[in-house]
A protein has these predicted regions:
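Structural signature of Gram-negative outer-membrane beta-barrels, strongest in the C-terminal barrel
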Residues: 340-356, 361-502, 584
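A beta-strand signature from Gram-negative outer-membrane beta-barrel systems
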Residues: 125-171
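Flexible loop and strand-edge segments within Gram-negative outer membrane beta-barrel domains
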Residues: 207-213, 222-235, 241-300, 305-330, ...
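Gram-negative outer-membrane beta-barrel transporters
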Residues: 387-390, 399, 494-503, 521-607, ...
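Extracytoplasmic beta-strand/coil segments of soluble accessory domains associated
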Residues: 68-109
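C-terminal beta-signal and adjacent terminal beta-strands/loops
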Residues: 549, 600-607, 615-617, 626-672
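Short, acidic, small-residue-rich periplasmic hinge/interaction motif at the N-terminus
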Residues: 20-60, 68, 98
Length: 672
């Protein structure tokens, strides 16, 4: 405990001199009327590490319908989707696994200390300004240290508050579609003065998710409908922005999410029975203060409180209702200090502190009441001159694990110990070089070392968890070339090509402890290599006619390299496809804009053993989107129709969890 107090004291001294901003570059700007020196699109080409972006216009023109659909349009991503509007959706990047993917919401990382995997199905696109994926280090060095702790970060940026007038602005929207889907959305925003703005967002989603599916049993084809799949989901946000003066700004957010859903379970022959129910609730509040002085120093301070609950019940459990519920909490604060002595150099120091704890409804689910203190510090330097940009970072991570005692009669010897404390220095470096002075063609290279602390489930879950686990260590290497052509008014082109090699050691996997019980151990070693390619082009025939095309392709080999004598050696890791790709072709015109889009994913295995007959077949999902925008003075109406999986393909992403076949969705959006 004395060590914790000492560390917090040192951190407290650091907090008085640290902070951050949310600009795309690391330039210092006045907080009033922020000017971004590069467009977000161009930054995907100049970045020293792979950066992929979908802004609000992309989401519309590419026919994106939900967060999972949006992520399919980004290279290097593998999605685990359990199907339907309420199905859990997690994402892994370049074979690392979902626990290695961080998710940032309006510049602050989301927390999931229990499983380490963020369920992205809870975040809709209706209030999103853009989504970006950073693989490696972010060129914007003015970020919390926590954003540097994962191999990849998915950034979700919501719509910004208005700055043009003091009139109230109201957005109303309703979506409805197949399988009982309906989702109303409301957003109110207003500038009350030139210093204070406010917005409120509300959203509700209901779906029966009773979609049909087919199941092959030898020569027999079974036709059935998904059952026990209903969902009720609500989400609300309050946001404010206060420009205290030209150099000081305070922003805040209050967020609440509630989803009461049934879990349909796996589809098996002759049965579709399930009594599982899950209610997820999440509340957080966060504030961010930004200031700058002297045109050289900038400071950002963020604080956040997060609470979430997962209430699980199975009414069909033998012997009565099975209740496995969990509650987790986090207190988090971060400060960052940015120093830009001249136009070439930038330096950032960031320090974070987080306290997390977890408790369950029974000692037989979580051993004791674990909690963790986390201290993170990062020092970053960035150098830019003409055609060369170099970035280097050193991250220090400290995890102090403890647990409250459980009654002596209720614990085993392994439960007497908390997880091990962990500390590590993690270096990273990246660079970008412009090949020709008159052409936007760049080569880039990067290296990043990082480690992942075991989650509370991996350390404390009854029988399954082990407090003796070591952290997973990852190394990632990337080389790439990028190109853009934007000098012609009627034609724009963006291309990127990256090759990578990743290495994971001390991988945490579950192995049989005895005939009936599995437990987590460090046994795995994984080698990953592949390529990511993207292409985006727009050709405008006239101000009202244009053709837009975007596409990406990824190849990834994710191999088990732990034991050469094992029959699984060099086999593809479970749920990692070798080939993925997507494309969208859009025709803009004065009448109805039309987009045809598709996703292709190759076959996968649901296990690392590759048992005969268990391979999940690859699939192609093609959709059609038609939309029209009409303007009436200052009011705007948008009508949109989406036909999903229009060729009615039956496929699975997760083994025995069939995805919906052909369906439709209608969206009506009116802005006052």
């Amino acid at each position: 405990m004395k060590k914790i107090v000492t560390l917090l004291g040192v951190l407290g001294i650091s907090l008085s001199a640290v902070a951050q901003t949310d600009t795309i570059t690391d330039r210092v700007h006045q907080l009033e009327g922020v000017t971004i020196t590069e467009t977000q699109r161009k930054h995907t080409v100049t970045s020293t590490s792979p950066l992929h972006l979908l802004d609000r216009q992309d989401l519309l023109t590419m026919g994106v319908t939900d967060i999972a659909d949006a992520l399919h349009r980004l290279p290097g991503i593998t999605i685990r989707d359990y199907g339907g509007a309420g199905g859990m959706k997690t994402v892994s990047v370049r074979g690392f696994g979902a626990k290695h993917t961080g998710v940032s919401y309006d510049g602050v990382m989301l927390s999931e200390c229990q499983s380490g995997e963020t369920d992205l199905s809870r975040y809709s696109l209706d209030n999103v300004d853009y989504i970006s994926l950073v693989i490696g280090d972010n060129d914007d060095i003015f970020i919390p240290a926590r954003q540097a702790t994962t191999p990849a970060v998915l950034n979700i940026q919501t719509l910004r508050l208005p700055t043009e007038d003091t009139n109230p602005h109201l957005t109303t929207q309703v979506k409805f579609g197949s399988f009982g889907y309906v989702s109303p959305f409301l957003r109110y925003e207003q500038n009350f003065s030139n210093k204070f703005a406010f917005s409120a967002v509300g959203e509700y989603t209901y779906a029966e998710n009773d979609y049909p599916y087919e199941l092959q049993n030898g020569t027999q084809t079974i036709h059935d409908y998904r059952t026990n799949s209903r969902m009720n989901s609500g989400h609300g946000e309050l946001n404010f922005l206060w420009n205290i003066n030209k150099t000081n700004r305070l922003t805040g957010k209050v967020y609440y999410y509630d989803n009461d859903r049934q879990l349909p379970g796996q589809v098996r022959y002759y049965t579709n029975l399930s009594g599982e129910n899950l209610r997820d609730r999440n509340f957080f509040g966060q504030v961010m203060y930004q200031t700058y002085w002297d045109d050289k120093w900038s400071l950002k301070w963020i604080s956040k409180f997060n609470w979430s609950a997962s209430i699980y019940k199975d009414d069909l459990m033998a012997g009565g209702i099975n209740d496995a519920s969990y509650w987790q909490r986090e207190v988090y604060t971060t400060v960052a200090l940015l120093y830009t002595p001249d136009e070439h150099w930038s330096f950032d120091y960031s320090a974070d502190y987080a306290f997390n704890n977890l408790n369950g409804s029974s000692w037989r689910t979580v051993m004791g009441h674990p909690y963790r203190h986390t201290v993170l510090q990062s020092a970053t330097a960035k150098y830019h001159i003409k055609r060369l940009t170099i970035l280097g970072r050193l991250l220090y991570s400290l995890y102090l694990n403890e647990q409250k005692d459980v009654p002596q009669v209720e614990r085993t010897d392994i439960q007497r110990n908390s997880a091990s404390n962990m500390r590590r220095l993690s270096p990273s470096v990246s660079l970008s070089y412009r090949l020709f002075a008159e052409q936007d063609m760049y080569v880039r290279a990067s290296y990043k070392n990082i480690f992942r602390s075991p989650t509370f489930n991996e350390s404390y879950y009854y029988h399954y968890g082990s407090p003796n686990l070591k952290p997973e260590t990852t190394d990632q290497y990337n080389v790439g070339i990028t190109f853009s052509h934007t000098r012609l008014k009627n034609w724009q082109l963006y291309m990127t090509l990256d090759g990578y090699y990743n290495h994971v050691k001390d991988m945490i996997v579950a192995v049989p402890y005895n005939m009936f019980v599995w437990t987590c151990v460090n046994v795995g070693k994984v080698y990953i290599y592949g390529i990511d390619a993207t292409l985006k082009t727009t050709y405008r025939f006239s101000p009202r006619y244009a053709i837009l095309f975007s596409g990406n392709y990824s190849y990834q080999k994710v191999e088990n390299r732990f034991n050469p004598e094992s029959p699984n050696y060099k086999k593809q890791i479970a749920y990692m496809p070798e080939h993925t790709g997507s494309a969208a072709l859009t025709f803009e015109n004065p009448w109805v804009n039309v987009s045809v889009h598709g996703v292709r994913v190759s076959s996968r295995w649901p296990n690392n053993d590759h048992y005969d007959g268990t391979m999940i077949e690859g699939y192609t999902d093609i959709g059609l989107t038609a939309y029209r925008q009409l303007t009436f003075g200052r009011h705007q109406l948008e009508a949109r129709f989406d036909l999903k999986n229009m060729f009615d393909e039956q496929y699975e992403i997760v083994y025995h969890y069939p995805m919906p076949r052909r369906s439709y969705q209608v969206t009506l959006n009116y802005k006052f």
